[in-house]
């Protein structure tokens, strides 16, 4: 990799570290190419990204970013998983690490907060941003639905009473 390519990579990584809300660092020693492809596809489906970069270049790219607290974790064969959703990368990384013991989560950073491996695992148990939005919408809609049911209930009861009265009148006429 020539000097210009390294500078481009550092600039790209710096932009990523500046804009993402979560970065997970893990050792990937022993993962096969098929395993890495599977991990990348799972991350992509969740809206996250996996990047393998030289630790030295990643250290340079971390300067001046909120997630600079992950610098001590960049030793050995490390990969960086990141996402704008604070939970997506952590969920996929933890789930993949459970299924494949060769992926070892070292820690991460959420904004300026450094996370140890247990912190990343705890973060992975939280619902995603989309799930939280769906719950909030459901909570907001539930009272409106109940109000509509309460308002419509007397009218429906009256309609049933009139219907039953009409049916009884028809049976009386037929008899």
Curated annotation (Swiss-Prot):
Q: Which InterPro entries match?
A: Ribosomal_uL10, Ribosomal_uL10-like_sf, Ribosomal_uL10_bac, Ribosomal_uL10_bac_type, Ribosomal_uL10_CS_bac
Q: Name one GO molecular function term.
A: large ribosomal subunit rRNA binding
Give the record's GO biological process terms: translation
PROSITE patterns per UniProt: RIBOSOMAL_L10 (PS01109)
Domain of life, per UniProt, equals: Bacteria
Q: Name one GO cellular component term.
A: large ribosomal subunit
Q: What are the record keywords, sorted?
A: Ribonucleoprotein, Ribosomal protein, RNA-binding, rRNA-binding
- Give the record's family classification: Belongs to the universal ribosomal protein uL10 family.
Oligomeric and partner information? Part of the ribosomal stalk of the 50S ribosomal subunit. The N-terminus interacts with L11 and the large rRNA to form the base of the stalk. The C-terminus forms an elongated spine to which L12 dimers bind in a sequential fashion forming a multimeric L10(L12)X complex.
Report the function annotation for this chain: Forms part of the ribosomal stalk, playing a central role in the interaction of the ribosome with GTP-bound translation factors.
Name of the molecule in the record: Large ribosomal subunit protein uL10
Per the UniProt record, the source organism is Methylobacterium nodulans (strain LMG 21967 / CNCM I-2342 / ORS 2060)
């Amino acid at each position: 990799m020539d000097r210009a390519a390294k500078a481009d990579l550092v600039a790209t990584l710096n932009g990523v570290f500046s804009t993402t809300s979560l970065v997970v660092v893990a050792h990937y020693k022993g993962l096969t190419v098929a395993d890495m492809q599977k991990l990348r596809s799972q991350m992509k489906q969740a809206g996250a990204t996996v990047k393998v970069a030289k630790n030295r270049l990643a250290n340079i790219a971390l300067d001046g970013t909120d997630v600079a607290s992950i610098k001590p974790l960049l030793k050995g064969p490390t990969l960086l998983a990141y996402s704008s959703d604070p939970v997506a990368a952590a969920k996929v990384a933890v789930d993949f690490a459970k299924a494949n013991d060769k992926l070892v989560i070292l820690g991460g950073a959420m904004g300026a907060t450094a996370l140890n491996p247990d912190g990343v695992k705890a973060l992975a148990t939280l619902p995603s941003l989309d799930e939280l939005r769906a719950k909030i919408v459901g909570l907001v809609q539930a009272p409106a639905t109940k109000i509509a049911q309460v308002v419509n209930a007397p009218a429906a009861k009256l309609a049933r009473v009139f219907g039953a009265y009409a049916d009884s009148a028809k049976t009386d006429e037929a008899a």
